[in-house]
A protein has these predicted regions:
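Glycine-rich oxoanion-binding loops at beta->alpha junctions
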Residues: 97-127, 139
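N-terminal signal peptide c-region/cleavage motif recognized by signal peptidases
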Residues: 19-21
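Conserved anion/nucleotide-ligand pocket segment
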Residues: 185-266
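Short internal beta-strands
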Residues: 76-85, 165
C-alpha cells in the first residue's frame, strides 16, 4: 500500500505531466493579435497607434497586446483607451474608470467609462489608427461592444481607421437568441438592433454595425456613421466551437466572468440578476451567474418543480451556500445550480425565466409586480418592455417564448453576409 507521501508524489508527478502536455499542445485557434504579429504588423507600420483593450487582450502565451504593440519596432503605440473595468481590469462592475497613465508603459490612458463613454476628439488627437482587442462574451448587454461602436463613431468623424483584432465568441457562432432591441430601449447595454445572443465574433459584429447603419449612438437615435474598418481574422476558428474548443487560455474580461463557462451562464441568469432583491444568481459566491437561490427557497421543491418542466438541454441540482459578499453575505441560502446537457438544444436565455416561473408557482413571488427601481434596467438589458409586462402578468415562459424567438431566423440570414468563418 502506498503511504500518504507516496500518493502525494504520484499526484504531483501526474500534475506536472499534465502541465507539460498542455504547454506542448498548440492552440487550435490563433487570435487576431498573433495573426497581426505574423504579418509584421501590416497596417500599423510607422503609424501612431491607439489601443482599446483590457487584460483579456493577450496572445496564446499570455503576453499582453499592450506589450506586444509597445515593443514592436515598427509600431508606435501612443495611447491606451479604457473600457469598463479599466485597461488593467482593476475596477469593479459599474465603477468609474479614471484617465491617467499606465504604470507599466507610461502611456496615457483615456477613460471610456467615466465622464464620457464615447471618446472625444481631443482624446484621439495624435493617433493615426485605432486598434481594438478585447475578448467578447457574446451577449448584447456586455458593454465592450458598445464601447467599440462609440469608438468607431468618433473615428469616423475624424477619418481615423479602426482595426479590430478578432477573437472567439465563447458561445460559438451558431447560437442566436432573443428579440431585437425595440425603439426607445436603446442604451449602453442594448446599443444595437441585434438579438441578445448574436452568434458573431466581435470582428463580424463590427462589420455588421458599420455596414448596416446600426452605429447610431447609445440611444439609437443619431445618424449612423461608417468608419474605415479592418478586421484581422483569427486562424482555425470554426462556428461550432465553444471557447474551450479553441485551446486558448481564458483571461477574465471582467471580474464576474472568471471562466469560459461563465460566459455561457451570463445570458442564462443575468436578466434575472437585474432584479436585485429577488434571487441570488451566484454573484458574491464562487459560481457567478450559475445558481438561483434565496433564504426562503426550499431547494428540493424548486428542483422538483423545474424537473417537471422537462426543459430541453438543461439539468438541475440542489445547492446550499453562503455568499461571501453582497446583500446576502454570510447567510445560508438554498436553490439550484443548472447544467447544459445539450447546449445546442437549450435556449439558454430562457433558463432564468423557467426558474422565475417555478418560484412563482411555489411562492407567488413576482419580481415585476409593484414599484421596482430595477425594472427600468431590466427593460434596458432586455431591449424591450414586452417581456417584463407579459411575463409579469402570467409568469409563464410559454407566453414570451414566441416573441423572444421571432427575430432569430431573419437575423441569422442577415448575419451570413458578415461571416468571416
Amino acid at each position: 500500500m502506498l503511504s500518504g507521501n507516496g500518493i502525494r508524489h504520484i499526484l504531483c508527478a501526474a500534475a506536472l505531466l499534465l502541465v507539460a502536455a498542455l504547454a506542448a499542445a498548440a492552440p487550435r485557434v490563433k487570435p487576431g493579435i498573433e495573426v497581426l504579429r505574423e504579418r509584421n504588423f501590416a497596417g500599423l507600420e510607422g503609424k501612431r497607434v491607439g489601443l482599446v483593450t483590457n487584460p483579456s487582450g493577450v496572445d496564446s502565451q499570455l503576453r499582453s497586446t499592450i506589450e506586444i504593440l509597445h515593443d514592436a519596432p515598427n509600431v508606435k503605440l501612443v495611447a491606451l483607451y479604457a473600457p469598463e473595468h479599466g485597461v488593467r481590469g482593476d475596477i469593479w462592475a459599474g465603477g468609474k474608470v479614471e484617465s491617467g497613465r499606465d504604470e507599466r508603459t507610461g502611456l496615457p490612458v483615456h477613460s471610456l467609462y467615466g465622464d464620457t463613454r464615447q471618446p472625444t476628439r481631443k482624446m484621439l488627437e495624435g493617433i493615426d489608427i485605432m486598434v481594438y482587442d478585447i475578448q467578447d462574451v457574446g451577449s448584447r448587454s456586455y458593454t465592450f461592444i458598445s464601447t467599440l461602436g462609440l469608438v468607431m463613431r468618433t473615428c469616423a468623424e475624424m477619418g481615423i481607421p479602426v482595426m479590430v483584432l478578432d477573437r472567439p465568441n465563447p458561445l460559438g457562432g451558431r447560437k442566436v437568441e432573443g428579440s431585437l432591441v425595440r425603439d426607445g430601449f436603446h442604451s449602453f447595454v442594448s446599443q444595437y438592433k441585434i438579438p441578445y445572443i448574436y452568434g458573431l465574433t466581435v470582428g463580424e459584429l463590427a462589420r455588421m454595425i458599420n455596414d448596416e447603419g446600426m452605429n447610431r449612438g447609445q440611444n439609437g437615435k443619431l445618424e449612423p456613421l461608417k468608419c474605415k474598418l479592418t478586421v484581422v481574422p483569427m486562424e482555425g476558428w470554426e462556428r461550432d466551437m465553444l471557447f474551450n474548443d479553441t485551446g486558448l487560455p481564458w483571461i477574465l474580461p471582467s471580474p464576474n466572468i472568471p471562466y469560459a463557462e461563465t460566459a455561457i451562464c451570463y445570458p442564462s441568469a443575468g436578466l434575472c440578476g437585474e432584479m436585485y432583491n429577488y434571487l441570488n444568481i451566484g454573484i458574491g459566491y464562487t459560481l457567478p451567474f450559475a445558481t438561483f437561490a434565496e433564504q426562503w427557497v426550499d431547494a428540493d421543491k424548486l428542483k422538483d418543480k423545474l424537473d417537471s418542466y422537462h426543459v430541453p438541454g438543461v439539468a438541475w441540482r440542489t445547492i446550499h451556500y453562503q455568499p461571501i459578499s453582497g446583500r446576502l453575505a454570510g447567510k445560508l441560502i438554498h436553490g439550484v445550480q443548472y447544467f447544459y446537457t445539450d447546449f445546442e438544444a437549450a435556449t439558454i436565455t430562457l433558463t432564468q425565466f423557467y426558474v422565475m416561473q417555478a418560484v412563482w408557482e411555489l411562492y407567488k413571488k413576482n419580481p415585476f409586480s409593484g414599484a421596482n427601481d430595477r425594472l427600468s434596467m431590466f427593460n434596458k438589458v432586455c431591449g424591450t418592455d414586452f417581456v417584463s409586462k407579459k411575463f409579469g402578468q402570467t409568469m409563464k415562459v410559454s407566453d414570451i417564448s414566441g416573441y423572444w424567438s421571432a427575430d432569430v431566423a431573419a437575423f441569422i440570414e442577415l448575419s451570413k453576409k458578415y461571416y468571416i468563418y
